[in-house]
Amino acid sequence: MDGQSSRANGAGCKVTRDVEYSRAGVRFTSDDPRQRPLRLDIYHPPVTLRAAGGWPALILAFGGAFHRGSREDDTVQEDGPKNTPVAEYCRRFAERGYVCFSIDYRLIPEDPDPGTIPVLVNPDNVPRSRLDVVRRQMNLPPATSEMVANGIEAAAVDFTAAIGWVRANAVRLAVDPSRIAVGGFSAGGRSAMHAVFARQAEAAAVVCLSGYLGLDELKRHVSGLPGEPPVLALWGENDLDYVREQAPALVEHAGAVGLPVTAHRIPGVGHFYPASTALAPSADGPATVEHAIEAFLASTLQRARA
């Protein structure tokens, strides 16, 4: 396994950076299509911790409207608090005893090859209010529906490949393949949902931070059949308009088909919020976003191994 290792925080987790997990096409519609490496960073639990039978794993993808962000940093601060980057979630959960992976994936400005198995039911119905804002911030012209769809499809392909790579290397990484959770923030969370529910990548749990599945994709891909993993869905009270609409729709549809979903509508925040953000008060529930993830993973991954 190639990559560069470093100790992230004194005696804390060790990070192996720049590990290639796949190669995939970019410049897809040009006269000069190319392949580029896809890389991930691995956050290993501290050497003081021990795991019998392999560690649980957490694979996370960054947010950025399928346009920007990276596996090292996807922080944004707009009109309020900034989000905790997925790399920091990886560090924190590695210190709890998870092997964590912060993954790279192809973005819309790279003109990615979308693959041959679409996950989107109706590409013309993809909400794009945030995407259009980000393109203006990046001084890019408006994107066509095809460009947007290709980027979303490519991200799902890449996340699926990352899950496959972790599973194929589970023994070498001391990962328990029955306890692999996936997730991400915003576009990363949506890509995790696409990989698991539309492309049938095998995972034991999904953590979706202000991501979603479109209504059409929910109806086609989420059936509640055995093998579909439980989902943790979190979103802000003042989140993006389509997230506020689609996240509750996931909860409703999941309830109808029997898919276990744990949902938290986070009071007083928009799309960007730190891990320390307080949840709605509850007598016996988690206090913060980070605690909600911790409780969900502890519960679902323990059941997956049982």
Give residue ranges: language-model regions.
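Short substrate-entry loop that stabilizes the transition state in hydrolases
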Residues: 48-55, 61-113, 215-216, 240-241
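Structural motif
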Residues: 56-57, 205
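Alpha/beta-hydrolase active-site loop
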Residues: 115-170
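Primarily recognizes the serine-hydrolase "nucleophile elbow" in alpha/beta-hydrolase
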Residues: 153-226
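The feature captures the conserved acid-bearing segment of alpha/beta-hydrolase catalytic domains
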Residues: 205-265
